[in-house]
């Protein structure tokens, strides 16, 4: 496998009014008990390390975390196996695991965004967008959607404010379910502090997919992966409505994606 440093990169140019961060951070404290609970999770460590000895951690039968990624020899890249598999949580191995960092094939998102991404002015979306300078294979990791981690109360306030002032909205809500029951909600806002993930626009027929990835913290990272092979110069987009599009809310803005199946409006996941 190529050295992770040859494939990944996180020194992208960004506008000055945004603090560039490498991974999600806690929102400023508002002193609420809701914030304290979020902070507790943020500061916790997942204690479910694998006990593999020098293996590749590829297989769920041998590694408690494995089975979600596969190494594509042709592209010399680790990729997410099948999108349907994400019904099972993606948990990467970490420094506390028994495996070796050099041979483990269950570490991807933790190495940061891929190289050859470019922020550009998208004429279709009449604002910034993100595109790739080179071909990206299906399942490849693009980047994290990193920003401030918000409480539900703070997210509702910011959404309302964005709506009232007609600002662009960067708040993303990801619900995780188990047996149809909602287990956890993760809300990320890269409007003030964020990474390159903040430039992906919404499409009703997207070429990227967003999934929850845990490394060593109970709060997942929001990982953006290629939903299909993506050609050089293609703009990267994902569906803002997330996992259950029947529950999408209408953000009140016309969608500019121009896909054949476009609903005509920009969605977001509802916050309950
Ligand atoms: C996460 S930001 C994406 C990056 C943004 N275009 C920029 O210039 O920074 C989300 C905002 O981009 C715009 N946007 C994204 N997808 C869109 C779409 N399909 N149709 C219309 N506007 C879109 C909306 O203003 C939305 O609030």
Where are these regions (language model features)?
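Alpha-helical interaction segments
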Residues: 10, 189, 228-230
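Catalytic cores of histone-lysine modification enzymes
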Residues: 73-77, 85-96, 100, 107-214
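Accessory low-complexity/Zn-finger-associated flanking regions
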Residues: 1-127, 254, 259-272
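C-terminal SET catalytic tail plus cysteine-rich post-SET Zn-binding segment of SAM-dependent SET-domain
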Residues: 2-3, 15, 77, 152-184, ...
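Short beta-strand element of the conserved SAM-dependent methyltransferase core
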Residues: 52, 130-132, 223-225
């Amino acid at each position: 496998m190529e050295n992770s440093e040859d494939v990944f990169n996180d020194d992208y140019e960004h506008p000055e009014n945004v603090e560039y961060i490498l991974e999600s951070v806690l929102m400023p404290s508002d002193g609420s008990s809701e914030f304290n609970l979020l902070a507790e999770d943020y500061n916790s460590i997942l204690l479910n390390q694998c006990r593999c000895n020098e293996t590749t951690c590829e297989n769920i039968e041998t590694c408690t975390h494995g089975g979600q990624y596969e190494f594509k020899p042709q592209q010399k890249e680790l990729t997410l196996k099948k999108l349907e598999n994400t019904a099972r949580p993606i948990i990467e191995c970490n420094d506390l695991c028994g495996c070796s960092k050099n041979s483990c094939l269950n570490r991807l998102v933790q190495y940061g965004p891929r190289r050859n991404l470019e922020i550009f002015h998208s004429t279709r979306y009449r604002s910034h967008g993100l595109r790739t300078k080179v071909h990206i294979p299906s399942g490849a990791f693009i980047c994290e959607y990193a920003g401030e981690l918000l409480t539900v109360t703070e997210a509702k306030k910011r959404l309302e404010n964005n709506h009232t002032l007609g600002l662009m909205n960067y708040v993303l809500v990801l619900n995780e379910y188990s047996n149809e029951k909602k287990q956890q909600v993760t809300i990320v806002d890269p409007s003030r502090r964020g990474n390159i993930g903040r430039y992906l626009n919404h499409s009703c027929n997207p070429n990227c997919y967003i999934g929850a990835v845990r490394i060593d913290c109970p709060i997942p990272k929001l990982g953006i992966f290629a939903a299909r092979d993506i050609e050089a110069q293609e703009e990267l987009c994902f569906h803002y409505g997330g996992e259950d599009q029947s529950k999408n809310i209408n953000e009140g803005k016309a969608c500019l994606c121009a896909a054949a199946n476009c609903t005509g409006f920009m969605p977001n996941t509802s916050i309950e």
